[in-house]
Amino acid sequence: VIEALRRGADILEPHGLVMVLEPLSDSPDLYLRTSAQTYMICKGVDSPSCKILYDIYHMQKNEGNLIHNMDLTWEEIAYIQIGDNPGRNEPTTGEINYKNIFKHLYEKGYKGVLGMEHGNSKPGKEGELALIKAYKEVDGFM
């Protein structure tokens, strides 16, 4: 796996492109399941073109202790996805304390993309308004 990813990174790196590896929680049979495993693979590839996609929803399901695990793998994280657990909806609809996570990302100086990979907990306009309210709430840590 590492050798194949190195070959891919060799193609991407001269162009400043980055591939991201995403550990998932949908099945225990999946190859990538933890942030530590993905971190070690990225370290083995040893290229700025091979990084971690840290999906907060999947990592909460697989390992919890989100801030600690983000810190352990920080230097390899290139992209972060958002989704609450359970339900994979907007922040504030599940158990994840997104206000603390957003505060931590801010304090770490994270300037990357935060992908909203989740559904809405309510349908239609009501759901869109709930989504906006949720993001305002979790972004209000200052």
Give the label of every model feature segment.
Residues 6, 32-54, 58-142:
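Histidine-acidic metal/acid-base catalytic patches
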Residues 1-15:
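An active-site-proximal structural segment forming one wall of the substrate-binding cleft
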Residues 12-45:
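Basic- and aromatic-lined ligand-binding clefts that recognize polyanionic substrates
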